[in-house]
């Protein structure tokens, strides 16, 4: 098939996903919806990399003892975290990556650096990443400074919007 990709599927310990769909080696599952919108019954969710599946498990699936399968499927929808398919075929179970807490923190900080521009927070982030300052008080100060700046900006915006009658 032309639109066929290697993907990765997380399941619970019993090889089921939310809604009770069973995932078995050699079996193809199909989405029941007609559209292509993520986070709906229109598509089956998967990841392009097993490490992303594990890192996003707490946010997306929340499986306590997940299993991961290499699957083949089409891609009809995607965001920066996952993809959506109309069909997915289970190839085989594979080893679940086990990122350390340091890998998880590093990933979170790198994601933050992609979008957050507060200079105090960015300085703390780079110091944490290069190992020069991983003290808890430095992290707390950076979080406080970043939150304070954002809250002030939000408060100013709220004041302006109300003053303008919006």
Task: Give the location of each predicted region.
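Short, glycine-biased loop/turn motifs at secondary-structure junctions and
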Residues: 1-166
